[in-house]
């Protein structure tokens, strides 16, 4: 009888060991990518800079645009995904009780040799202001673990540089925006 229980214990533990899930990221705001082949990697983390730009037309003639941009240093992310690859992301938040669409943003950057930028807001000379100008990528999300979400982009990501931000719904005044960056190769 002992041998039967021992055998069942070994079989059960081996089944549970192979069904082990990917761990949640350690800190709120961190993001891990799950690739199509089930391998994982933490995304590159960058502290963003806020940048304001006045168009040439506004400088020369007084008519033009004033833009606010989110900028991170470096042309390219160190985390590269293959074009057309099916991916999911595990995003750690403060908790997973908030609608993820309200706190998680996936967006595309404009990449230059020394930086990556995304327009956050713009105002023209005539007073029209647009906010939330980021090129958002839609996604579906489910709760994952104790305080994370597993998110799946709703569209195939085109080649380019991308960022994910996670805001804290409990904090009224966030001082710095941390961007988790990745790239989709051509």
Identify the meaning behind each predicted range.
Residues 20-124, 168-186:
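Primarily secretory-pathway and cell-envelope proteins
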Residues 82-84, 144, 157:
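Surface-exposed coil/turn segments at beta-strand junctions on protein surfaces, enriched
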Residues 121-146:
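Extended, solvent-exposed segments with strong compositional bias
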């Amino acid at each position: 009888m002992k041998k039967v229980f021992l055998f069942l214990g070994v079989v059960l533990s081996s089944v549970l060991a192979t069904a082990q899930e990917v761990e949640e990221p350690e800190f709120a705001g961190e993001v891990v990518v799950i690739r199509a082949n089930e391998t994982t990697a933490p995304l590159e983390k960058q502290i963003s800079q806020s940048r304001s730009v006045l168009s040439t037309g506004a400088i020369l003639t007084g008519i033009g645009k004033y833009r606010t941009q989110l900028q991170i240093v470096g042309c390219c992310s160190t985390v590269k995904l293959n074009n057309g690859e099916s991916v999911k992301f595990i995003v750690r938040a403060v908790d997973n009780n908030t609608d993820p669409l309200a706190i998680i943003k996936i967006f595309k950057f404009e990449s230059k040799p020394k930086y990556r930028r995304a327009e956050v807001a713009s105002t023209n000379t005539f007073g029209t202001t647009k906010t939330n100008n980021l090129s958002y990528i839609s996604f579906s999300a489910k709760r994952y673990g104790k305080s994370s979400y597993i998110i799946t982009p709703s569209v195939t990501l085109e080649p380019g540089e991308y960022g994910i931000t996670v805001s804290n719904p409990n904090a009224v005044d966030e001082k710095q925006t941390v961007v988790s960056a990745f790239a989709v190769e051509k």
